[in-house]
A protein has these predicted regions:
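A carboxyl-terminal module marker
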Residues: 675, 679-702, 706, 728, ...
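Solvent-exposed, membrane-proximal periplasmic/extracellular interface segments of envelope transport
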Residues: 60-75, 695-697, 701-713
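Short secondary-structure junctions
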Residues: 13, 519-522, 677-690, 734-739
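Inter-lobe coupling/hinge segments of SF2-like helicase ATPases
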Residues: 206-213, 217, 221, 230-667, ...
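A general secondary-structure signal for short beta-strands and their flanking turns/coil
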Residues: 2-4, 17, 46, 436, ...
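Accessory, non-ATPase domains that flank or precede helicase/AAA+ motor cores in DNA-metabolism machines
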Residues: 1-371, 383-399, 680, 718-725, ...
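A short, contiguous, amphipathic alpha-helix enriched in charged residues
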Residues: 4, 32-34, 519, 665-679
């Protein structure tokens, strides 16, 4: 029963982010413990602020302490492991305590300040009420008189197998009136239970034996000792596309559950969750919970409560699912581990890999990274024995990898074909349609035409709020900014010189239109951010494609990874050249991964696969290695480049970003921070450090906000983090006449 507590308060700036000591009223002392959410008076006006208790019996900062306003119920309390994750995030991402708290608790489970019925007293109010429902259980026998009705007999028969909820009984035709009558007779007992929600209740439980190939069994056998050991371990499962990595996952999860432990499975994108959920729920049943941002607040809260209450053995979701309140974790799987979506781009700027590694240590679990194209850092670590390397070199069923053809689009143009779809690809699609097979086309540009350029001055029409080109969307007849969302009617004259604007480029909307012209009888599905904006759109559209309601699917990167359709035998890659010349040290890795992954969507069942890559740079070594699907050769080339340029894994890469409405202020803030960092670093001359910049961000302005950055090549250890932390504190203490904000990303790809 603590009399004082240390509270992390919401909305604290980095400089003032510490634990503030509060006194606890006697009637609150039984309710308060580590991890409790509280409402506190803060500042001169004692304004009500949210907080979380991170220390009990804290040392008073003064003789006169303020008292807590209110304490949330124990159901909202952070578990000890999640509390340790809050401290981990605070230490490793330069966020505030409360930013870390918000990361580990979903919106629906949080509270907000409110006023009690007296109109004066500050209290906590739940964002969403905790959902409960009636549950009935059999406690007595039916009296012989009066004669029981058919519905009463049916209710007793159903409840003989165990308690049922009102919804479950009503689904069987048993009304609430019948149940109330039986309760009054002492036959049934009614109680309130937390309402559960099965988001994929239509998936039938198959629970079929998991049959592995000889190579898959060898991979499973290699990983099993690590899974069964109580100590933490890590491994990389590197398998070619279509090698059946998911079957190995299922076998490991089954063994994990047999041990009485739980499993956490991460996928990089929401679009990949339906297929993973289908595999898991059909194999393991209802005790699978889902966590991702496309769930509404109620769904996410109910899933979170299900996990917290011990109702889930398996959790599957995107990056944020790593914070699920799952206990006794035995296995953490990060599928497609190379994807950038596992790194958060807003505070706290964490890497799901780092948090997963921490949770594996906390639970003595196996952390399994998996990919057909592992990140260079992960494969390097496996090569050097820092993590176990397990390979799958053959496709499931013995199918060969797809045959790949590279088409030179310069030759197409010279031959009189100005279209974005080459004659080779057109012919291949036609043959595929005639054979009754399906085609996937990757085009990493949404919209209709990707830019408007003046014929006279050559200026490109750019967003007035961002330093990026506007994109024409034909369906809406608007030009849109894909960064800030600005839109306007498509202009016909250049705003710079009055010349004529010519719309150029090829996006998914135009590709859909071109395909309809070339193949009028084909059913074309477009998969991009526009077509999948509605709730559950990913799942529904992919299900329709799987049911052969479409012949061709054209889309952005969301069609490239993790999808498994047995009748897809052709893949086309369009417009890849822009990615070959993208900024950032991961550019080649990203291109290789994207092409290898999408090519791997073809020929995954009975029939062999074929792929066509269109480019104006057919001799590019990365394209040719991707066409050959030779990851080992690509890795040797990439690791040599990383070593020469001093990039990860040979150093850490920290980017400190500065943003504000006035460019001159942002530039000055970045320069001042760089000077302070140099002063602090001079005190530790043996600290390995290389500072580049400040320079403008790769996109200088987004939504009327200018961006500058400092890039630091470093060793990401406690000494370096302490250096950055002390520099941040000095910078904020100076109170420069600037409204520029500062953000630190320790897991950056080179921008922020």
């Amino acid at each position: 029963m603590p009399k004082t507590v240390g509270v992390a308060v919401s909305n604290a700036t980095f400089h003032f982010d510490k634990l503030y000591t509060y006194a606890v009223m006697p009637d609150q002392q039984n309710a308060v413990k580590l991890g409790s959410m509280v409402l506190v008076p803060f500042g001169r006006g004692s304004r009500a602020r949210m907080g979380v208790v991170l220390a009990c019996d804290a040392e008073p900062e003064s003789a006169k302490l303020k008292y807590l306003f209110d304490v949330a119920p124990a159901s909202a309390c952070l578990t000890p492991e999640l509390l340790r994750l809050v401290h981990f995030l605070k230490e490793h991402t330069f966020c505030t305590y409360y930013e870390a708290v918000k990361a580990v608790i979903p919106y629906g489970a949080q509270y907000k300040p409110a006023v009690a019925a007296d109109g004066v007293t500050p209290v906590l109010q739940k964002q969403l009420t905790r959902h409960t429902e009636n549950s009935y259980r059999l406690v007595g026998g039916l009296p012989p008189k009066p004669k029981p009705t058919a519905k009463q007999l049916a209710a007793v028969a159903l409840l003989g197998g165990g308690p049922r909820t009102l919804n479950e009984l009503e689904d069987k035709g048993i009304s609430r009136a019948v149940l109330d009558n039986l309760c009054a007779k002492g036959v049934l007992e009614c109680s309130k239970v937390n309402k559960s929600i099965d988001l994929y209740s239509s998936i039938p439980l198959k629970n079929e034996p998991i049959t592995l190939t000889q190579e898959q069994q060898a991979a499973y056998d290699a990983l099993l000792p690590k899974l069964e050991d109580d100590a933490p371990h890590s491994a990389l499962l590197y398998g070619v596309t279509g090698s059946g990595k998911t079957l190995v996952f299922l076998k490991l999860i089954a063994r994990c559950l047999e041990q009485g432990r739980r499993a956490l499975v991460l996928v990089p994108e929401i679009s990949l969750t339906p297929q993973m959920i289908l595999r898991l729920k059909s194999q393991f049943g209802r005790r699978v919970a889902v966590q991702h941002s496309a769930l509404n607040h109620t769904e996410r809260l109910l899933q979170w409560q299900m996990i917290q209450d011990g109702g889930a053995d398996i959790v599957v979701g995107t990056r944020s699912a790593i914070f699920s309140p799952l206990e006794n974790i035995g296995l953490i799987i990060i599928d497609e581990e190379q994807e950038h979506t596992y790194r958060s781009e807003s505070a706290p700027r964490y890497s799901a890999h780092e948090v997963a590694r921490q949770r594996a240590v906390e639970n003595g679990a196996l952390l399994l990274l998996a990919s057909a194209t592992p990140s260079t850092e992960s494969f390097y670590a496996a090569q050097h024995g820092r993590t176990q390397l397990v390979r799958l070199t053959q496709r499931y069923g013995g199918n060969p990898l797809p045959t790949v053809q590279i088409v030179d689009m310069r030759a197409e143009l010279a031959a009189g074909n100005p279209r974005e779809i080459s004659l080779s690809l057109e012919d291949a699609i036609r043959r595929n349609l005639d054979a009754g097979k399906q085609t996937i086309l990757l085009l990493n540009r949404r919209g209709y035409q990707t830019m408007a350029q003046c014929e006279d001055c050559r200026e490109v029409l750019k967003c007035t709020k961002c330093s990026v080109p506007m994109v024409y969307h034909k369906a809406a007849h608007k030009v849109l900014c894909h960064y800030c969302g600005s839109q306007m009617e498509p202009p016909t004259v250049c705003p710079a010189c009055g010349g004529k604007l010519q719309y150029r480029g090829f996006g998914t909307q135009k590709a859909e239109e071109e395909l309809a012209k070339l193949f009028p009888d084909a059913r074309v599905l477009r998969m991009d951010q526009d077509s999948t904006a509605a709730k559950d759109a990913h799942e529904k559209l992919l299900a329709r494609f799987a049911n052969h309601e479409y012949d061709i699917m054209v889309g952005t990167q969301m069609v490239a990874k993790g999808l498994d359709f047995e009748d897809v035998t052709l893949v086309g890659v369009l417009g890849i050249d822009s990615l070959l010349f993208a900024q950032g040290f991961r550019a080649y890795e990203n291109v290789f991964s994207l092409i290898t992954q999408v090519v791997g969507r073809s020929g995954r069942a009975r029939d062999p696969g074929f792929a066509i890559i269109q480019t104006t740079d057919p001799d590019n070594p990365v394209l040719n290695l991707a066409a050959a699907q030779d990851y080992d050769a690509f890795f040797e080339q990439e690791i040599a480049y990383r070593k020469l340029g001093l990039y990860p894994p040979f150093c850490g890469l920290c980017v400190i970003g500065f943003a504000g409405a006035k460019e001159i202020e942002v530039a000055r803030a970045a320069a001042r921070f760089a000077a302070l960092l140099g002063q602090q670093a001079a005190k530790q001359p043996d600290l390995p450090l290389r500072v580049l910049g400040p320079t403008p961000g790769s996109i200088e302005k987004i939504n009327d906000t200018y961006r500058y950055k400092l890039t630091i090549k470093c060793r990401n250890d406690r000494r370096f983090r302490d250096l950055v932390r002390s520099t941040l504190e000095r910078y904020e203490q100076e109170k420069l006449p600037s409204k520029a904000t500062v953000a630190v990303d320790l897991h950056s790809d080179g921008d922020i």
